[in-house]
Structures are given as structure tokens and as C-alpha cells.
């Protein structure tokens, strides 16, 4: 039995917020702000976006390690946040997230048609998220009401490690019956999500405009001038540079062209780990 390179993609493994649903990735961001506020600690939207892509407990821990936020917490409680304090914030975050997730549950405009086309071309659609399963179940339910059902879903608490570790992406490979990680493309709007795909040995596509990095609504994105959009693209490309995505595109609606290019490269014998 001999090894041979895959010659075409078999699966796209997609993030959720900022990738397929919730243009601008507002659902988790706003709730982080509200959860900290319930402890009389101010966190801005921009600060809350910083660690996006991680599991939510890790996200809160990372925010609490930011010196400015830790100092605000110390002024209220007389100490910097411990892991138990992080858990207290997380336990307030969770019910708020479940309660308000529907507010930001709309599909990315055009995403459903794009994914339908990819499936017609033979791709399986896996997915994973920084949300825990109790939130993910609600996200999946709301997406199904809007016509989107992934072939597999992996929440951050269903594997030993969340992003940027590769476990969630690899859990999709196993569940979907994919025979080679190089036959998968991981699509995400965050650096931890791209690192997840890289470490899993997959092709990676970073989304520049639909997610956390740009942080605008669909209407805000559409209102940008050509000069503003180009400036934001340059800023966000630099943000992703260290995670080395194979491709950067504005939204998931450009993914079919990327898939076609990856298939061309695979047919030539190119592999994602080599680039």
C-alpha cells in the first residue's frame, strides 16, 4: 500500500460567527462587554475582539491578563483576576450569550447559495466554533431555520483543546470520513482559527471583511469607500500575516474561486504544508 497525494478537496471546515453567520461577529463580542460590566469592569468592544477565535473561558482569561483590564478589575475587587474569577465571569457570560444569540443569527448575505454550490461540487461541509456546545446547539438551530445545516459541528468543549490547537478541525476530518487532511480547507475570520487549520495540515482561508477583524455590520461594510476598504484590507492582511493563511478573501462568497485554485494546485502535486 502506497501513499498518494489527494488530487482534489473533499471538505470545507467552516467557522460560524463572522464566517457563515453574524456578519461582523457581534454576538460574542457584545456579550463579553456585558458580562464584564456586570462585575463593574469596563471592557471596550475593541478590547473584547482581541482574543476572538479562542474558546470562551480562554478568551476571558486572556482579556483578564491584559494589564489595563486587570488593573480595572483590581480597582473594583482589590486583586487581579484569578482563574476562579474568570470562571465567575464565564458563568455570567454563558446565560447572556444563550439569551441573546438570536439577535445576531442571520446568515452572511450570499453564504447559503455559495455553500449549496460547493456541496453540488462534492464538498462536505464541516464546522467548528469557539462557542461551547450549549451555545452551539442554539446557533445550529437558528441557522437551520435559515436554511443552513452543516454536515458536522464541533464545539470548543467537545475536544481536549480548543483553538489554536488543531483538535476541532481534526475531529471534523474523522467524523466526515476524510482520508487526508490536505484534502480539507479551513475557513475562519480569526487568527486562532487559521492557526488551527495550519496545525491540522489543511489549506487555510482567512476572511478579511465579514468577521472580527473588520468588525462592521454588512451595511457598514457596504458603506466603505474604495479607499477605506483598501486601507482596512492592508491592516487586516498584516494582522493575519503571522498565522500564514494560504488565501485571504473578503467573504465566504469568494470561496468557490479559492476551492478551484486549490484543486488545481493539488492536481499538480502541491500540498498545504509546503507553503
From Swiss-Prot:
Homodimer. Belongs to the HAD-like hydrolase superfamily. PhnX family. This is Phosphonoacetaldehyde hydrolase. HAMAP family: PhnX (MF_01375). It catalyses: phosphonoacetaldehyde + H2O = acetaldehyde + phosphate + H(+). Disulfide bonds: none annotated. Mg(2+) binds at residues 15, 17, 189. GO terms for molecular function: magnesium ion binding; phosphoglycolate phosphatase activity; phosphonoacetaldehyde hydrolase activity. Its EC number is 3.11.1.1. InterPro entries: HAD-like_hydrolase_sf, HAD-like_sf, HAD-SF_hydro_IA, HAD_sf, PGP-like_dom2, Phosphonoacetald_hydro. It holds the Pfam family Hydrolase. Binds 1 Mg(2+) ion per subunit. It comes from Pseudomonas putida (strain W619). Its cofactor is Mg(2+). One of its GO terms (biological process) is DNA repair. Involved in phosphonate degradation. The active site is at 15 (nucleophile), 56 (schiff-base intermediate with substrate). Keywords: Hydrolase, Magnesium, Metal-binding, Schiff base. GO terms for cellular component: cytosol.
Amino acid at each position: 500500500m502506497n501513499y498518494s497525494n489527494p488530487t482534489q478537496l473533499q471538505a470545507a471546515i467552516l467557522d460560524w460567527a463572522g464566517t457563515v453567520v453574524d456578519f461582523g461577529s457581534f454576538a460574542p463580542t457584545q456579550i463579553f462587554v456585558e458580562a464584564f460590566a456586570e462585575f463593574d469592569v469596563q471592557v471596550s468592544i475593541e478590547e473584547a475582539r482581541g482574543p476572538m477565535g479562542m474558546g470562551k473561558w480562554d478568551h476571558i482569561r486572556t482579556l483578564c491578563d491584559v494589564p489595563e483590564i486587570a488593573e480595572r478589575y483590581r480597582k473594583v475587587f482589590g486583586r487581579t483576576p484569578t482563574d476562579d474569577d474568570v470562571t465567575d465571569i464565564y458563568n455570567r457570560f454563558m446565560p447572556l450569550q444563550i439569551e441573546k444569540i438570536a439577535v445576531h443569527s442571520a446568515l452572511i448575505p450570499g453564504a447559503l447559495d455559495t455553500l449549496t454550490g460547493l456541496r453540488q461540487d462534492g464538498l462536505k461541509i464541516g464546522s467548528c466554533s469557539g462557542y461551547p456546545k450549549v451555545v452551539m446547539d442554539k446557533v445550529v438551530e437558528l441557522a437551520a431555520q435559515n436554511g443552513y445545516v452543516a454536515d458536522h459541528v464541533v464545539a470548543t468543549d467537545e475536544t481536549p483543546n480548543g483553538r489554536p490547537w488543531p483538535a476541532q478541525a481534526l475531529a471534523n476530518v474523522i467524523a466526515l470520513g476524510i482520508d487526508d487532511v490536505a484534502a480539507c480547507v479551513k475557513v475562519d475570520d480569526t487568527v486562532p482559527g487559521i492557526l488551527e487549520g495550519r496545525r491540522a495540515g489543511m489549506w487555510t482561508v482567512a476572511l478579511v471583511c465579514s468577521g472580527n477583524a473588520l468588525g462592521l455590520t454588512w451595511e457598514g461594510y457596504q458603506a466603505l469607500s474604495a479607499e477605506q476598504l483598501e486601507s482596512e484590507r492592508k491592516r487586516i492582511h498584516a494582522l493575519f500575516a503571522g498565522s500564514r493563511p494560504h488565501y485571504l478573501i473578503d467573504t465566504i462568497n469568494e470561496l468557490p474561486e479559492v476551492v478551484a485554485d486549490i484543486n488545481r494546485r493539488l492536481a499538480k502535486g502541491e500540498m498545504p504544508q509546503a507553503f
